[in-house]
Amino acid sequence: MVVGRLLSENRGIDILIKFAIKYPDLRYIIVCANEVKGDKSGQALLSLHRNGTNKNGRIIGAIGTNPFLTCSQTDIEPFRTQTEIYNLIVSKDMQIIKAQLLIFFCQ
């Protein structure tokens, strides 16, 4: 298991994509906690996983201030197919987040 902060909707997601490609056993990502005002990095990650990017590297559907990635489509597409993302952004309840983690460990 890896736990970390996604600090931005661009560089942070680029780093996460490269990490996931390097470690193909990474299958599940839980997006939780508060969004950073302006960046909306959690929402951007969910949009990337759902919609991908346009030809300019802009995350389709992202509503943050700078949702542009430098990763190539060759990296983005395997990331999108390799991982499942669970949206718990609105959940402030640690019991719900812990329950979701237990589901992953029992699989």
Residue ranges and their predicted role:
Residues 1-55:
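Conserved mixed alpha/beta catalytic, RNA-binding, or beta-rich assembly cores of soluble enzyme
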Residues 95-107:
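Charge-patterned, long linear interaction tracts outside catalytic cores
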Residues 19, 68, 79, 104-105:
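Phenylalanine-focused residue identity feature
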Residues 33-90:
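Long, charge-dense
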